[in-house]
Structures are given as structure tokens and as C-alpha cells.
Amino acid sequence: MADVEDVRAFALTLERAYEVFVRGRRKFRVGSLVFVAFSDDEETIEFGFPKDERDGLIASDPDTFSLPAPSDLRFNWVRARMDRLDPVEARELVVEAWRMCVPQKVARAWDEAHPDGP
């Protein structure tokens, strides 16, 4: 099971990433772009994910993944239950969400420094 503190510690290692609290919710940003957000109770994580791929992700494991709230459907977001994610999968999703917010050269530098992934 993925743990909020593990996700937090990992997210903060990513270049340009920082943590904020918005209306009591823990979020991680690059600049003004949010790439990860937790629910109020921190039982679900929402993360950036390409819109054209999210139906496939959700279909692959509907007990874990779901669409975001209707008000967020216009954004590149997917929601996941923390109790269904393993720590490695959570880190991979966080990196991919972060990648959507940083310049390509920053993402490439991370890839070069971490050839085996997170």
C-alpha cells in the first residue's frame, strides 16, 4: 500500500517541485501547475495523466483508478485509491505527472540520472 508520507518525500525530491496546502488539501506543484493532490482524508490521490490515456488506465484496474470529480474532467487528471497502489506504482505515477509540468530538458536530466526509473 502506498503511503502519503512516502509519496510526499519522493515528490519533494523532484526538481522544481514544492508542497502547498489549498483549503486543507495537500498538493504538489511545479510553478503554478499542480501535478499531485490528495483528498482531504488523504485516502485518494489525484495526479496529472494524459486525457487520451486515462480511459485505458481506469479500465485496467477500475477498483484502483477513477475519473476525477466532474468539475475536474476538463483537466488531465485521474484519481486513485491509496490503499490499492503499491509504493513503486505510486512513485511512477508521480514522476509521470511531474513530467507533464516541467520543461523537457528537466525531465530528460531526471531520466539520465535515474535510468531504472523511480
Model-derived segments and spans:
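Charge-dense, helix-prone N-terminal extensions
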Residues: 1-118
